[in-house]
Amino acid sequence: MEGTVTSNVSASGMGAITAVLMQLCNAGDHVVSSRTIYGGTYAFLKNFAPKFGINTAFVDITNLAAIEDAITEKTTVLYCESVSNPLLEVADIRGLSKIAKKYNIQLVVDNTFSPLSISPKVLGADIVIHSLTKFINGSSDTIGGVVCGRQELIDHLRNVNDGAAMLLGASMDSLRAASILKNLRTLHIRMKQHSHNAMYLAHQFKNDGIKTVYPGLESHPSHAIFKNQMNEEYGFGGMLTIDVGTLDKANALMELMQKENLGYLAVSLGFYKTLFSAPGSSTSSEIPEDEQKEMGFSEGLIRFSVGLDNDIKRTYLSMKKCMVSVGIL
């Protein structure tokens, strides 16, 4: 799927991420990372990796000049998400690849938010990571991760003497692997529907005057970059965010939508039902509030993982009723 020579599965997405970073970095090495990434990855790089002498500079991944300025002679890894969690910033993977090659560092891309829609390896990434838990499995009933890369890297990860994937123990069991493989066979169908539904909701929410962020909207700052990188038939992905002003309104809306069976208030994504959460107090809660504000988080931010609803117009009209009911519209 990602076009790499081989891959290695793990017991979780974080099992894949941490193994790669520990394999690529030694004590004294340096990482340049996007500042808007999954909270668990941020916590690992910010709080855990320094225990081993690995330090990280967090930068605006959309600012290529700032990224290049952050690179030092100790930098070994440039890390980003193809579409960031949860602010949906889009990485210019071709531009990042040029920088990585210029300084002989590894470009590692987490592609969890955009499987099939974006192919990081084709665009120049050295290593591609997924949380299999999300879109690829698609049914929120198991946990897994995968590292896709060159044979040499995967062999090193599996080495019984010094391989991080082997020695840290985050191995996937065979039953989980078989279950995910079964669901993988419908990913191409599911991603088209996720993208179709997300695009519809994004346009409707925007037309209603709600602050909406979705890479498929021309108003998105990186719309052109995503469009230039995408595999067109799979669309712009199933993730979008809206800002309803306050956390109280966000919680009231999510609770009412769940009550009306429009989806679930949950921190995962890629499920066949729509999932919604307030990232600042959930998936990004590891990031201090002052840093969240610097990154562009707001209290009223709601992240939607749009489901596979057959009648998305009906879903939207029901969501709009909920928004009117709680005073958002």
Which positions does each model-derived feature cover?
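FAD-binding core of FAD-dependent oxidoreductases
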Residues: 135-141, 176, 267-280
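Conserved PLP-enzyme active-site core in the AAT-like
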Residues: 4-213
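Short, well-ordered beta-strand elements within core beta-sheets of diverse protein domains
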Residues: 180-189, 237-245, 303-307
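Conserved small-domain helix->loop->beta segment predominantly found in fold-type I
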Residues: 199-273, 287-293
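Short, flexible turn/loop "capping" segments at secondary-structure junctions
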Residues: 138, 172-174, 231-234, 295-299
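A common structural junction motif
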Residues: 165-166, 257-269, 321-329
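PLP-dependent enzyme catalytic core of the Aspartate aminotransferase-like
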Residues: 46, 69, 247-248, 255, ...
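Glycine-rich phosphate-binding segment of PLP-dependent enzymes
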Residues: 1
